[in-house]
Amino acid sequence: MSTKIVAIGDQFIGAQHYQSALNGAPISFDSVDLPGTKEDQHTAQQVMEVKGPNSVDPDNKVLEKIKSANIITAHFAPMGKKLIDVAPDLKLIAVARAGLENVDVQTATSRGIGVVPAFGRNANAVAELQIGLMLAEARNIARADASIKEGGWRKDFPGARIEIGNSTVGMVGFGQIGRAHV
């Protein structure tokens, strides 16, 4: 019996991307994309971030597809108790992001189902943003932009002569994002 993977695509990572990544693997593969728009997905994400993964019902097409799944891979799809209970052979939930707000980890763990997030998936992007924000703060970019938009042309911002090259700057921690700076 081959391992059956079901990919649940969404408005940001479609199921075809999972299929492409798993092409050639000795598995049985099926997929389904969540219906709706990016706005619908964003609303569902916000609800799950506040109320948890059981606050948004899974799509009926998803429930039908995962009944015989051994592995589910998804990004933001709601994977609460209702979804987990439909798949008696489920062994692993792989999430294509670091956050697990959309997964009922307690239910999965109680059933012996592994839950694997993609820690550090966006670490480089966040590290680059962090460098940009440090530069923006040191050089007063946001305040200068706001002043210009209001018709001003300030020439005297506090710290205007600060240059990163002559400063000690950094971040606290050496997790995924901290290591991206090294």
Where do the model's predicted regions map?
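Phosphate-coordination loops involved in phosphoryl transfer and adenosine-cofactor binding
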Residues: 2, 90, 165-168
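Short hydrophobic/charged patches on amphipathic alpha-helices used for structural packing
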Residues: 60-63, 81, 161
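Phosphate/diphosphate ligand-binding glycine-rich loop within oxidoreductases
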Residues: 67-145
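Short gly/ser/thr-rich secondary-structure transition/capping motifs
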Residues: 52-57, 74-75, 149-156
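Alpha-helix capping/helix-boundary segments
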Residues: 13, 78-80, 177
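N-terminal glycine-/charge-rich "phosphate-binding" loop or analogous flexible N-terminal tail
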Residues: 1-71
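Cofactor-binding loop segments of dinucleotide-utilizing enzymes, especially the Rossmann-like FAD-
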Residues: 8-10, 98, 174
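Rossmann-like dinucleotide/phosphate-binding beta-alpha-beta segment
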Residues: 158-181
